[in-house]
From Swiss-Prot:
The keyword Protein biosynthesis applies. SMART domains: Arg_tRNA_synt_N (SM01016), DALR_1 (SM00836). Belongs to the class-I aminoacyl-tRNA synthetase family. The gene is argS. It is found in: Cytoplasm. It comes from Oleidesulfovibrio alaskensis (strain ATCC BAA-1058 / DSM 17464 / G20). This is Arginine--tRNA ligase. It is an enzyme of class 6 (ligase).
Length: 551
């Protein structure tokens, strides 16, 4: 926020003039009530003791100097025990329009990352069936987080971890094999555990099509054929579903490759050498209790099978070997108990605890006609992501997934999302952009187009409280991006966009732009609206949502 940075710089200069130290815990934030100004600072409260004077007396000295040295500050008041409330003159806010015009699509970008290498792993659904709506929420969060981190100065790579090894893959192959037997009319007992969806039957039919002698092959060979084709087919569908959802990954990493390249054994050797892995009862254990876990964990079972944890440690070892400074995993909330042991593993690999973070994504409650839609991959009773995107569109689905904190459950109302009304959040924001574009088009048709670069004289008429409110919000976009990037929380962007859209719609209702009292006010307001449209576009792009020019 330019205003926040300006006030901090001004206060530092004043504090230096008073020959006082700059304290650590200075708060400069917009007050809850706008009547108290644009920003409130607690500088006098935290400096009172070093200055050896009452906070209000110190605040008086600070405010006097602020008013003397900074003409862009139009008002300073002391509140309560010594808070300093600052109000900026309109021309200070007018400069925000210039900044948007100069930066364009980069307005709001910050360099908090400073080139640090970040890897974000998301979706990583088992290739045992189509993506469901819960996967869609994780996909939207991961893809948007990657966009935002790049915008915030991080060198960002995205990855999908393909769980193509282990028991689930064996079960998938067996499910297809069972269905193939059914198709051929064999009287076979239904397995106690298998994947039941229609997609399994479709895959079995395709396997029989190119391998008509499947059931004549040795069972082990037939199962291998079924498993490989099923994994390849399902992964192709997953890739397509994500592409249709405007989600991409830079790397698709195979779990199987960890075993085939010896990466798992290499990680085991590293843990043994550091005394963190040990043999007991024929199994290999990891001392996760050394890092705060509630018990030690098995890496390799006594029957020789690897645990998921073993592969995950080797996988993260591989991530750090590729030079990432921060690894972010996006998991379903049902994996919350897995977080402490993975943190332990990262520290055991010799990496800082803060080099690894997990975003937990809560469930999506999909509603249709007021009733919740059941989702179970094995039972085949789930609403696929592809179905939802086809019904409501990628834009609406993405925005809804990003409209709440990731760790909060989300009610996804299919009927609401399809409505072209102000009750629909994505429509509300997109329509704000389309509404501005419509005003700009109509103004151009009448022969009035805002200047490419607005000068101070042109913007002088912008003094109404509604206009200043929008300028404040535009100025705050950079702060929002920084907060979202540092907290790994993309919902900050969707919240901000809804607030900015609300200000725009309110302004539009109260001030019919094309009916402005005179040409000067019209041109100033057109410049303001064009800046707001740019910020809406930038924010929507971070969410992977389009900014239509007409709706």
């Amino acid at each position: 926020m330019r205003a926040k940075n300006h006030l901090q710089t001004a206060l530092k200069a004043v504090v230096a003039d008073l020959e006082l130290p700059w304290p650590d815990k200075v708060s400069i934030e917009p007050p809850k009530d706008k009547k108290f100004g644009d920003l409130a600072a607690n500088i006098a409260l935290v400096l009172a003791k070093p200055a050896a004077m009452p906070p209000r007396e110190l605040a008086a000295r600070i405010t006097e100097r602020l008013q003397q040295k900074y003409p862009e500050i139009s008002g300073v008041e002391i509140a309560g025990p010594g808070f300093i409330n600052v109000t900026y003159a309109p021309d200070f806010w007018h400069r925000t329009v210039h900044m948007v015009e100069q930066a364009g699509g980069r307005f709001g970008s910050v360099n908090v990352g400073n080139g640090r290498k970040v890897q974000i792993e998301y979706v990583s659904a088992n290739p045992t069936g189509p993506l469901h709506i819960g996967h869609g929420r994780g996909a939207a969060i991961g893809d948007s987080l990657a966009r935002m981190m790049r915008f915030a100065g991080f060198e960002t790579s995205t990855e999908y971890y393909i769980n193509d090894a282990g028991r689930q893959m064996l079960l998938l192959g067996a499910s297809v094999y069972y269905r193939a037997k059914q198709i051929k009319g064999l009287d076979v007992a239904e397995p106690e555990e298998y994947y039941r969806g229609d997609y399994i039957r479709d895959i079995a039919s395709e396997v029989l099509g190119f391998t008509p002698d499947l059931l004549e092959k040795p069972e082990e060979e037939a199962l291998a054929v079924c498993q490989k084709y099923a994994v390849d087919t399902i992964m192709a569908g997953i890739r397509q579903d994500l592409a249709d959802f405007s989600v991409s990954h830079d790397v698709w990493f195979s779990e199987k490759s960890l075993v085939e390249t010896g990466a798992v054994d290499k990680t085991f050797d590293r843990l043994r050498r550091s005394g963190l892995a040990y043999e007991e009862d024929g199994a290999l254990w990891f001392r996760t209790t050394d890092f705060g876990d509630d018990k030690n964990r098995v890496l390799k079972k006594s029957n020789g099978y690897l645990t998921y944890f073993a592969s995950d440690i080797a996988y993260h070892d591989n991530k750090y070997d590729r030079g990432f400074d921060l690894c972010v995993d996006i998991w379903g909330a049902d994996h919350h108990g897995y977080v402490p042991r993975m943190r332990a593993a990262v520290q055991a690999l010799g990496k800082p605890a803060d080099s690894f973070d997990v975003i937990l994504v809560q469930l999506v409650n999909l509603l249709r006609n007021g009733e919740q839609v059941a989702m179970s991959t094995r039972a085949g009773e789930f609403e696929t992501l592809a179905d939802v995107v086809k019904e409501v569109g990628a834009d609406a689905a993405r925005f809804m997934f990003l409209s709440r904190k990731s760790d909060s459950s989300l009610d996804f109302d299919l009927e609401l999302v399809k409505q072209r009304s102000m009750d629909n959040p994505v429509y509300y924001v997109q329509y704000a952009h389309a509404r501005i574009c419509s005003v700009l088009r109509k103004a151009a048709e009448r022969g009035t187009t805002p200047e490419t670069h607005s000068d101070e004289e042109l913007l002088k008429p912008l003094v109404h409280a509604d206009e200043i409110d929008m300028l404040r919000l535009v100025d705050r976009f950079e702060d929002t991006v920084e907060a979202a990037a540092t907290s790994l929380s993309v919902h900050h962007i969707s919240y901000y966009l809804q607030e900015l859209a609300s200000a725009l719609h309110r302004f539009y209702a109260n001030h019919p732009v094309l009916n402005a009292p005179d040409e000067q006010i019209l041109k100033a307001r057109l410049a303001l609206l064009r800046a707001v449209a740019q910020v809406l576009r930038n924010g929507l792009d971070l969410l992977g949502v389009s900014a239509p020019e007409a709706m």
